[in-house]
Amino acid sequence: MRFNQYSYINFPKENVLSELKKCGFDLQNTANHKDSLETFLRRFFFTYQDTNYPLSILAADKKTDLLTFFQSEDELTADIFYTVAFQLLGFSYLVDFEDSDVFRKETGFPIIYGDLIENLYQLLNTRTKKGNTLIDQLVSDGLIPEDNDYHYFNGKSLATFSNQDVIREVVYVESRVDTDQKGLSDLVKVSIIRPRFDGKIPAIMTASPYHQGTNDKASDKALYKMEGELEVKLPHKIELEKPQLNLVQPQGKAELIAEAEEKLTHINSSYTLNDYFLPRGFANLYVSGVGTKDSTGFMTNGDYQQIEAYKNVIDWLNGRCRAFTDHTRQRQVKADWSNGKVATTGLSYLGTMSNGLATTGVDGLEVIIAEAGISSWYNYYRENGLVTSPGGYPGEDFDSLAELTYSRNLLAGDYIRGNEAHQADLEKVKAQLDRKTGDYNQFWHDRNYLLNAHKVKAEVVFTHGSQDWNVKPLHVYQMFHALPTHIHKHLFFHNGAHVYMNNWQSIDFRESINALLTKKLLGQETDFQLPTVIWQDNTAPQTWLSLDNFGGQENCETFSLGQEEQAIQNQYPDKDFERYGKTYQTFNTELYQGKANQITINLPVTKDLHLNGRAQLNLRIKSSTNKGLLSAQLLEFGQKKYLQPYPAILSARTIDNGRYHMLENLCELPFRPEAQRVVTKGYLNLQNRNDLLLVEDITADEWMDVQFELQPTIYKLKEGDTLRLVLYTTDFEITIRDNTDYHLTVDLAQSMLTLPC
């Protein structure tokens, strides 16, 4: 384990003493260090009647147990303090470590022995081996009462609200959209779990079209075959109009009553970060949105009608929209328990909705935590004039996603009444998708949140993985740079795939978000501020660094690609084409081994480099015909240890999100030997070589100069490493699978790779 502590806040000594005293640690500034440590530990072991016993089973050094040490005349030393501290954090002395000073350096332990009271205070705010901070572990065990009131420690809310005796209710928010054109505003179901409190509380809202269930069968039927010819497009410039949103006004009157009438029973799934905040005094709201089970309307996937309906839930929390008790719309309830302040959470589609919501500039949305979210839907299902698939999901497109999330069809009555209209709406979507050309058009323009990024007022926290080929890093990169300069923005850029990171051992992500939301949503005045970029170092396990920016580097490193011309044959023998199509993983393996139709260029790294931003290929290239698809991957090549893209469980159900509440696995990205690691990749239709909105002819056997930016990333390379650039045509995981007989030729002498460093 390595400690990477970003959540700790330096407080004045009087605040430290006061907070310790409120938790029963009655330490005196004038007492000697040894007496203070003993006083602290006897309170620490509050679950024991006889505190001599737990002291006797800890060690002060290799020859002395802690009780014997306190009974002796020996002085407290730094070595003894560290030895005790590590044991309190769950490490076994003489098993996990033998020399506390060596272990302190190996783990990056954040505490330097000196002022013992401040050391003990920070120790309570440090994560244990099993994932909780020490103070959270003690509170979970009953250190302070579960009194349904707020208690703070180091600028963070503690788990002092019951997670068993909570209010569970359902309301139906009246949206300002009518997606199915029935003349009534769509209703959106809101599932609420909130602690009991005599006052107003903030809300954590997860906008998830998946929450009410998914129609996997219908979605699978809507998948496309990726086999087909790359379209030869007519040259033209793409014209666009400013997206428009037509809102509807509330209709009719409804009796105001005091409480919701529908009780929330079981929910499909909760998000463990939300679970963590519930006993800390934050309401949990789950909203599936229009076109989902128990709501009304069509599934409009990603457009501002869908976003508006989610926004209207925040409006209701602030008294600007109505919520009914049921679908009759006869009775309404107010969110009189809400303080109007909201944060959004969730990954993938959920993080996408956070991005979209932020761009409305809605009042009350204080913070978004957008994890692996889409910033422009074109870049999810298309790339540079090509029809593409999200990584791992060949053949998926917008209509299959709509079928997946239109969970109203899971209710037989809704299916009978509404499926015909839903299918008609889906046909309109299919026509607008334009799978023929892969070009950007008005449909995608209406789902591009970057156009409204200037409206964002909320503080923004992103998480994204360098190995996320589902929602690719370009999404967070573009959103990060499109935000107004005056707002606070932060990015946790890890080396995983399309995954959550709130339960990783190496970083205090939950606690950092607690500090932020306690400040922004509960009004606690602290100077807590996350760094702009928190980056997971790819060269070592469990190592995180603060950076000033993502991209924007002034310097670059250029690699020449060679001296000759090389060709990429597009067509495969039928047997190989069929084999790769059945299992794209086989294609990826053979591509990395140099066995596919490809140009492979090994580039020695002659000095330490820190890539930060978008690698760019400048290529002199020609096609043997009037079309061309170019794929590129940049690898770090060579057998060595690399961080793996998916977290592994270190210990099962050891993270407590409250008081024995929703126990969670402790995880981390493994660091183990592999033959290579993908650094970045990209795909380009050569007819869109100069601009996404400009389609140009390709003249057979005529040289073209192409600038081709790959996916943004942050990656450290060391002198002696090897980069491998792979250029090829069809990518059997991502692109259309065109097996026509043509080839691309690259003049390597007139081509280069540029890395921003």
UniProtKB/Swiss-Prot annotation:
Keywords for the protein's UniProt record, in alphabetical order: Aminopeptidase, Cytoplasm, Hydrolase, Protease, Serine protease
Top EC class, one word: hydrolase
Range of residues in the leader sequence: none
Record's catalysed reaction(s): Hydrolyzes Xaa-Pro-|- bonds to release unblocked, N-terminal dipeptides from substrates including Ala-Pro-|-p-nitroanilide and (sequentially) Tyr-Pro-|-Phe-Pro-|-Gly-Pro-|-Ile
One Pfam family recorded for the sequence: PepX_C
Biological processes, Gene Ontology terms: proteolysis
Keyword Protease in annotation: yes
Keyword Cytoplasm: yes
UniProt-annotated location(s): Cytoplasm
Family of this protein: Belongs to the peptidase S15 family.
Protein's job: Removes N-terminal dipeptides sequentially from polypeptides having unsubstituted N-termini provided that the penultimate residue is proline.
Record's subunit section: Homodimer.
Protein name per its UniProtKB record: Xaa-Pro dipeptidyl-peptidase
Organism in which the protein naturally occurs: Streptococcus pneumoniae serotype 4 (strain ATCC BAA-334 / TIGR4)
Gene name of the record: pepX
